[in-house]
Amino acid sequence: MGFRVLVLIVMVTTSALPFTFSEESGRSPFRPALRSEEAQALRHGLTLLLARRADGQPSDMRQPEMRRPEMRRPEVRRPEVRQPEFAESPVGQKRWDVNDCIHFCLIGVVGRSYTECHTMCT
């Protein structure tokens, strides 16, 4: 989120930086070259983004279905981690315990927290 705001601020700032020389008397010799609808839209978007951030609302103002496909989070089907029954363990092998379950849950599935893994394994 912070990176997007920084990029937007840089875009708005750099859009106002290109200057053209103005030879009109009584005016500053430099004036912004870019006073387009695009610059106004960027400023308006930044204002809305900062206002939403101050209100604690999500930063993306568009509906999820209107986002570009690369911006959508892929739906990942996570395999169910379960504790095997005692009967499934071959004789002579160590029985699967809660700590092993939590360990493999944490390293095997990206994005799971310790609390999620503990809840699933117990």
Swiss-Prot record:
GO terms for molecular function: toxin activity. Residues 23-96 form a propeptide. It comes from the Eukaryota. Keywords: Cleavage on pair of basic residues, Disulfide bond, Secreted, Signal, Toxin. One of its GO terms (cellular component) is extracellular region. Residues 53-91 are annotated as: Disordered. Residues 62-85 have a biased composition (Basic and acidic residues). Residues 1-22 form the signal peptide. Expressed by the venom duct. Disulfide bonds join 101-121, 105-117. It is found in: Secreted. Belongs to the conotoxin R superfamily. The cysteine framework is XIV (C-C-C-C). This is Conotoxin flf14.2. It comes from Conus anabathrum floridanus (Florida cone). The lineage of its organism: Eukaryota, Metazoa, Spiralia, Lophotrochozoa, Mollusca.
